[in-house]
Amino acid sequence: MALTQEQKKQFKSIGHHLKPVLIVAENGLTEGVLAELERALNDHELIKVKLALAERDDRRALLDELCAQSRSDLVQSIGKMALVYRKNPKPNKNLSNISRFAGI
């Protein structure tokens, strides 16, 4: 699902207030990282991810793989931080960052 510019704008404003819920280090996308990514996307829909890799090309490749494996959309990537979104068909209004910060 491709995000519209209006959605990206809204998600960026919400993402500004978020802290990273997932940190991907040198080991890349391990089973544990993928399991936590699935849990975070199911709970929060919009999450901030920190990529602890030095090289820009490595971060970009890892981010592309992360989005492909989780079937999510990249909203924004700045430096070592990325904002990732995947719609949950039945979001929990208390956990979903989209529902919680909709008024921002």
Swiss-Prot record:
Keywords: RNA-binding
A GO molecular-function annotation: RNA binding
Origin: domain of life: Bacteria
InterPro entries xrefs: RNA-binding_CRM (IPR001890), RNA-binding_domain (IPR051925), RNA-binding_YhbY (IPR017924), YhbY-like_sf (IPR035920)
Residues covered by the CRM domain: 1-97
UniProt cross-references to Pfam families, sorted A to Z: CRS1_YhbY
Alphabetized PANTHER family for the sequence: RNA-BINDING PROTEIN YHBY
Protein name: Probable RNA-binding protein PA4753
